[in-house]
Amino acid sequence: RALGPLFPSRLFDQYLGEGLFDYDLLPFFSSTISPYYRHSLFRTVLESGISEVRSDRDKFTILLDVKHFSPEDLSVKIMDDFVEIHGKHNERQDDHGYISREFHRRYRLPSNVDQSAITCSLSADGMLTFSGPKVQSNMDTSYSERPIP
């Protein structure tokens, strides 16, 4: 970004409608509370609204922070080789005024995910977990020596 530190990158990140604070706009100035106290410049993944995709040997998992949405505001669909997660809520009041939020995420499913065994759950703290087991192919997946025809 050409403007660098003049404009905080948080404005362009995936924070779903959270308000800006003084430390977002001027992160390099010390706090008025104490010169030794300073807010963290980095937020944790669980607070950020950013998704995490894990593709292990046995399982494919998507973790998504949707704490601003109720279960009725969310929809999860599988279309062909993609999973689509959509969330939308109408205007309502929060700590910073009135806000409406909407997001749409689309992820490609690996070809070896068993689509009939996919599960999706929403935890009490607003973490959506989408996971599906991977089926093992008949082909030997070890990286030992094997002939190539």
Swiss-Prot record:
Keyword Phosphoprotein listed: no
Residue sites binding Zn(2+) 1 per the record: 89, 91
Domain sHSP: 41-149
One GO biological process term: response to heat
GO cellular component: cytoplasm; nucleus
Protein location: Cytoplasm; Nucleus
Keywords annotated in UniProt: Cytoplasm, Eye lens protein, Metal-binding, Nucleus, Zinc
Disulphide bridges, residue numbers: none
Main location (coarse class): cytoplasm
Alphabetized InterPro entries for the sequence: A-crystallin/Hsp20_dom (IPR002068), Alpha-crystallin/HSP_16 (IPR055269), Alpha-crystallin/sHSP_animal (IPR001436), Alpha-crystallin_N (IPR003090), HSP20-like_chaperone (IPR008978)
Pfam families with a match to the protein in the record: Crystallin (PF00525), HSP20 (PF00011)
Protein family per UniProt: Belongs to the small heat shock protein (HSP20) family.
Role of this protein: Contributes to the transparency and refractive index of the lens. May act as a chaperone, preventing aggregation of various proteins under a wide range of stress conditions.
Protein name: Alpha-crystallin A chain
Species the sequence originates in: Trachemys scripta elegans (Red-eared slider turtle)
